[in-house]
UniProtKB/Swiss-Prot annotation:
Family: Belongs to the glycosyl hydrolase 56 family.
Matching Pfam families: Glyco_hydro_56 (PF01630)
Native source species: Bitis arietans
Protein name: Hyaluronidase-1
Tissue spec. comment: Expressed by the venom gland.
A molecular function GO annotation: hyalurononglucosaminidase activity
GO biological process, one term: hyaluronan catabolic process
Compartment list: Secreted
Catalytic reaction annotation: Random hydrolysis of (1->4)-linkages between N-acetyl-beta-D-glucosamine and D-glucuronate residues in hyaluronate
Signal peptide: 1-23
Single GO cellular component term: cytoplasmic vesicle
Subunit annotation: Monomer.
């Protein structure tokens, strides 16, 4: 009965969005008057400090941690060894903390997590992204396939040792029940602790939600990009996780096999569509902010995204109504002076200019359509409308002097531009505002803020 209720709720929200009506307002943006932001989550500290290569992140409207560090006041990412005593098996086959969640003390984990949060985020007024990256196992038994099947096998073995008198069938049922109960407690209580300690942060788990639409390698031209129905149903069953999250962190990493292809857009679009669906069903008062993880280079390579794929990732993310995009990167970006220079060249070329284009266009649309009280979202999510600066009306220039380098947008919105925006985009008002153009105070929402 509970699962049926969740499905009905999800279907209702989906229909509301399809009809061009947002079921609920959005949370106010992370920074005032910035409806769509781009954040940097790559360990590139060595570029400016060691190699004296400034990546010019600030120049091109990218928000980064102080010294371009991986974790800090803007984004802090918690890997398995950074937060509590996370039970798991790593990629090398090493065992940690009882391997499975039902074989480790939750109290011990939370006590350690508390000290880890204080260590990694000393500022109690932290207002950044708190991203927990736990990918070794999934909280749902049926999603632990492939290499993750070891957690099911270990759980069965654990249950058998505790209850040798039970039949195989009962052992498996018990193992599943105890595993999912413990996994839920670990994830939920960790999240609630983090939110209690740093209540102004945006907390959630990396790669949640996922939609498992990775079959582009086998489907070829038959690939649709759609999330399998079973995976959407499983996401519905994680309502407890969405309700306790204060942000969602899906990813849209592109492998090089997808370079400049129709399949790349299908892959990204449906992952975003599922994330926005989950964001709308998580709470009653506002849709969760969605910060989408992407890479400026193709996954597992050091090859920059093409202009087309920048549109596919950054452009699609903004048009679908996400709060921002987070560029993640590896140590390779800052491994040598040449690596740093390669990132800088890309930043000063297609990447930086496109980021300025989209972030500025999102801001202009928010001003023109939503009176700065909401963000622009496609009227029809499957359309090909993008939040881009109109080339006949705007131009991007980069000015530099002895102290700073800045990308500046010059121009003004023409009537034909405004007509295009009104035809293709609608406003998702921030909490406290309502109306077609977010022109009215919403007393009900203001009381909730």
């Amino acid at each position: 009965m509970y699962h049926l209720w969740i499905k009905c709720l999800a279907a209702w929200i989906f229909l509301k969005r399809c009809n061009g009506v947002h079921a609920m307002p959005a949370k106010a943006p992370m920074y005032p008057n910035e409806p769509f932001i781009v954040l940097w989550n790559a360990p590139t500290t060595q570029c400016p400090l060691r190699y004296k290569v400034d990546l010019d992140l600030k120049t091109f409207h990218i928000v980064a941690n102080p010294n371009d560090s991986l974790s800090g006041s803007v984004v802090t990412i918690f890997y398995p060894n950074h937060l509590g005593v996370y039970p798991h098996i790593d990629e090398r086959g090493h065992f940690f903390h009882g391997i499975i969640p039902q074989n480790e003390s939750l109290t011990k984990h939370l006590n350690k997590s508390k000290s880890d949060i204080n260590r990694m985020i000393p500022l109690k007024t932290f207002h950044g992204l708190g991203v927990i990256d736990w990918e070794n196992w999934r909280p749902q038994w049926d999603r632990n396939w492939g290499s993750k099947n070891v957690y099911r096998n270990r759980s069965i073995q654990f249950a058998k040792e505790l209850h040798p008198e039970l039949s195989e069938d009962k052992i498996k049922r018990l193992a599943k029940k105890e595993y999912e109960k413990a996994a839920k407690s670990f994830m939920r209580d960790t999240l609630l602790l983090a939110e209690e300690m740093r209540p102004n942060g945006y907390w959630g788990y990396y790669l949640y939600p996922d939609c498992q639409n990775y079959d582009y390698k086998t489907k070829g031209d038959q690939y649709t990009g759609k999330c399998p129905d079973i995976e959407m149903s499983r996401n519905d069953q994680l309502l407890w996780l969405w309700r306790d999250s204060t942000a969602l962190f899906p990813n849209v990493y592109l492998e090089i096999i997808l370079r400049s292809s129709d399949n790349a857009l299908k892959f990204v679009h449906h992952r975003l569509k599922e994330s926005m669906r989950i964001a709308s069903m998580a709470r009653e008062d506002y849709a969760l902010p969605v910060f989408v993880y992407a890479r400026p280079f193709y996954a597992y390579t050091f090859e920059p995204l093409t202009q087309e794929d920048l549109v596919t990732t950054v452009g699609e993310t903004a048009a679908m109504g996400a709060a921002g995009i987070v560029f993640w990167g590896s140590m390779q970006y800052a491994s040598t002076v040449d690596s740093c220079q390669k990132v800088k060249t890309y930043m000063n070329g297609p990447l930086g200019r496109y980021i300025v284009n989209v972030t500025t266009a999102a801001k202009i649309c928010s001003h023109a359509l939503c009176r700065k009280n909401g963000r622009c979202v496609r009227k029809h999510s499957d359309s090909n409308a993008f939040l881009h600066l109109f080339p006949e009306s705007f131009r991007i220039m980069v000015h530099a002097n002895a102290t700073e380098k800045k990308a500046i947008v010059k121009g003004k919105l023409e009537l034909k531009d405004l007509i295009y925006l009104r035809k293709n985009f609608m406003c998702q008002c921030y909490q406290g505002w309502k109306g077609l153009y977010c022109e009215e105070y919403s007393i009900k929402d203001i009381r909730k803020i």
